């Protein structure tokens, strides 16, 4: 055809299978045989006709597969109108011109009549495991859901897993090291995408990534380094904080160490609040100790964007550290983080937690959709209960509080106030209480102090790191290895 050299009959005759959509076109097995013979006869006639050379281009004619045989225009006749040609060509798809030979196929056909050279045939048969026409599926939906924050890639060749650090509801945290420099260590949080989607936590994990990215430059907040995803998991790579969780290393605190740690946690919380973020998960497990024993906040899975002065109603957090207004199902704001800080301070000073009449502060089990009422008590009811109980309004504090210094009792009273509006809610307010008299509550000032020196001076015991057993560690690695 065109300018291509004539072939002999044995090479030019090809076997063509009828397209997959033949039923829709009204074709049958007999039609199929008829068209094979018709195509062969037309090809022989065209080879016998004199060829007309064109100096600048080749003339390519297509004939559509229809029930009525179509004839080529002899040289010199007028061509069909463009619209008619388009109707014929609409059934066919043009592949590519390779080595002066045309590759073309019937749209939707499983196998079709094709002119190909050897190289083209090899490349096409190797595509999709040598199955021509196999559908290229789009990326998994779970990838698209997280694509705005987590790029699709693999980091297996960059990091190696050292050991398991922590386990959670959605995944695990590993200590990993760089393969190019084993002295560079990181914390790798691996989360199951299926669990996040099942728990409707997609927006939550995206907020966590955004918040840690925005606030990670603060000296008392863990820095985020990288985010990525693969088919099954999300990965958050952060700086590694070597001395682990606060209470896993230290169980008894002097008043000077409490003053330092409460100040550092307060500065981190105040920074988050001023950035329009509520933390909602302040607890010892999320307070890590650096190599110099300064603190860093981690795990922003329950954090939320919330402007100062605004309220939210989501019931979340760890029960022991949840403020009364959360447990009562009332709207709450950033003051809940300061309550949690008070609970941590109470634990450091007395080794016990406050007891807020938990039989009254039970979780909401049901909320009526009509009026939003809850069976939990109100703040006013709690205050009334405390005032009617034996003793003073500090009845929920441990008895050991009575043996503390004035500074220790004062900081607990101001942080653990039932009424949120009367609670300490800023570093500025914290600076005015007795424990921070003549003390500069700033990041620069606190970083200039040495917790190690305070620990050594006050004879505070530091416990060794505790790791997961080998079986648990290996099971976690096997479950989350594909990073």
UniProtKB/Swiss-Prot annotation:
SUPFAM superfamilies the UniProt entry points to: Protein kinase-like (PK-like)
Entry keyword annotation includes Transmembrane: no
Residues reported to bind ATP: 165-173, 189
Location(s) in or outside the cell: Cytoplasm
Alphabetized GO MF terms: ATP binding; protein serine/threonine kinase activity
Biased composition (Polar residues): 1-19, 55-73
Entry's Gene Ontology cellular component terms: cytoplasm; cytosol; nucleoplasm
Highest taxon of the lineage: Eukaryota
Biased composition annotated in UniProt, kind: Low complexity: 41-54
Enzyme class: transferase
Stored CDD domains: STKc_AGC (cd05123)
Keyword DNA-binding listed: no
Domain Protein kinase: 159-435
Obligatory cofactor(s): Mg(2+)
Complexes and interactors: Interacts with tkv.
Family: Belongs to the protein kinase superfamily. Ser/Thr protein kinase family.
Its job: Displays kinase activity. Inhibits neuromuscular junction (NMJ) growth by interacting with and promoting the proteasome-mediated degradation of the receptor tkv which inhibits bone morphogenetic protein (BMP) signaling.
Matching PANTHER family: RIBOSOMAL PROTEIN S6 KINASE
Protein name stated in the entry: Serine/threonine-protein kinase S6KL
């Amino acid at each position: 055809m065109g300018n291509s050299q004539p072939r002999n009959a044995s090479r030019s005759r090809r076997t063509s299978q009828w397209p997959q959509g033949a039923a829709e076109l009204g074709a049958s097995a007999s039609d199929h045989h008829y068209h094979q013979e018709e195509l062969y006869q037309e090809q022989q006639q065209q080879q016998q006709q004199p060829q007309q050379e064109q100096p600048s281009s080749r003339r390519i004619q297509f004939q559509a597969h229809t029930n009525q045989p179509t004839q080529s225009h002899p040289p010199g006749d007028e061509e069909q109108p463009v619209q008619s040609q388009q109707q014929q060509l609409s059934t066919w798809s043009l592949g590519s011109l390779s080595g002066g030979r045309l590759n073309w196929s019937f749209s939707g056909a499983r196998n079709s009549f094709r002119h190909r050279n050897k190289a083209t045939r090899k490349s096409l048969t190797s595509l999709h495991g040598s199955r021509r026409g196999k559908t290229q599926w789009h990326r998994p939906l779970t990838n698209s859901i997280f694509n705005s924050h987590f790029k699709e890639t693999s980091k297996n060749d960059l990091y190696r897993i050292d050991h398991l650090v922590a386990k959670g509801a959605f995944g695990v945290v590993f200590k990993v090291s760089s393969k190019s420099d084993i002295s560079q260590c990181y914390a790798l949080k691996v989360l199951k995408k299926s669990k996040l989607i099942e728990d409707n936590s997609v927006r939550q994990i995206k907020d966590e990534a955004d918040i840690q990215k925005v606030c990670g430059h603060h000296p008392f907040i863990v820095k985020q380094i990288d985010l990525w995803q693969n088919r099954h998991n999300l990965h958050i790579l952060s700086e590694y904080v070597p001395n682990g969780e606060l209470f896993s290393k230290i169980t008894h605190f002097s008043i000077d160490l409490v003053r330092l740690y409460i100040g550092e946690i307060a500065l981190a919380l105040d920074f988050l609040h001023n950035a329009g973020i509520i933390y909602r998960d302040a607890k010892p497990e999320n307070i890590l100790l650096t190599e110099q024993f300064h603190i860093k906040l981690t795990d922003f899975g329950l954090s939320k964007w919330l402007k100062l002065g605004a309220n939210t109603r989501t019931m979340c957090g760890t029960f022991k550290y949840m403020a009364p207004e959360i447990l009562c199902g009332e709207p709450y704001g950033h003051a809940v983080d300061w309550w949690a800080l008070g609970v941590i301070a109470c634990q450091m000073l007395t080794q016990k937690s406050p007891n807020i009449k938990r039989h009254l502060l039970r979780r909401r089990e049901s909320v009526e959709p009509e009026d939003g009422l809850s069976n939990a008590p109100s703040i006013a009811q709690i205050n009334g209960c405390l005032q009617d109980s034996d003793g003073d309004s500090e009845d929920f504090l441990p008895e050991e509080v009575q043996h503390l210094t004035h500074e220790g009792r004062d900081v607990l009273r101001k942080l653990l106030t039932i009424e949120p509006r009367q609670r300490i809610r800023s570093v500025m307010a914290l600076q005015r209480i007795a424990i921070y008299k003549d003390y500069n509550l700033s990041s620069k000032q606190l970083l200039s102090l040495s917790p190690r020196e305070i620990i050594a001076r006050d004879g505070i015991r530091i416990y060794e790191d505790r790791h997961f057993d080998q079986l648990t560690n290996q099971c976690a690695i096997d479950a989350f290895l594909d990073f």
